[in-house]
Amino acid sequence: MEVNMPTTEQGQKNKQMIPSPGPGGGSGPGPQAPKVEKPNTEEILKRMRKVDPDQARRYRQRTGE
């Protein structure tokens, strides 16, 4: 049994890659990423210390603060 695989000589079309825009960019009709501010880490850590001090410490280590 012989399997014929299409090659570029046999008419397979090459797809041209179009670079995608960065996050939040793009002027196309598709959905766009929301433009949101980065949360204030000091406020997050203060709230986390009230709830669970150990979790706040682990978060601080994980984020490099």
Swiss-Prot record:
User: Which HAMAP family does this UniProt record tie to the protein?
Assistant: UBact
GO molecular function term, any single one:
protein tag activity
**Compositionally biased region (Polar residues):** 1-17
Where is there biased composition of kind Basic and acidic residues? 35-65
Query: Transmembrane region positions?
Result: none
According to UniProt, the name of this protein is: Prokaryotic ubiquitin-like protein UBact
Q: Hey, which family's this protein in?
A: Belongs to the ubiquitin-like protein UBact family.
Q: Which Pfam families match?
A: UBact
| Placement of covalent cross-link Isoglutamyl lysine isopeptide (Glu-Lys) (interchain with K-? in acceptor proteins) | E65
Underlying gene: ubact
- Purpose: May function as a protein modifier covalently attached to lysine residues of substrate proteins. This may serve to target the modified proteins for degradation by proteasomes.
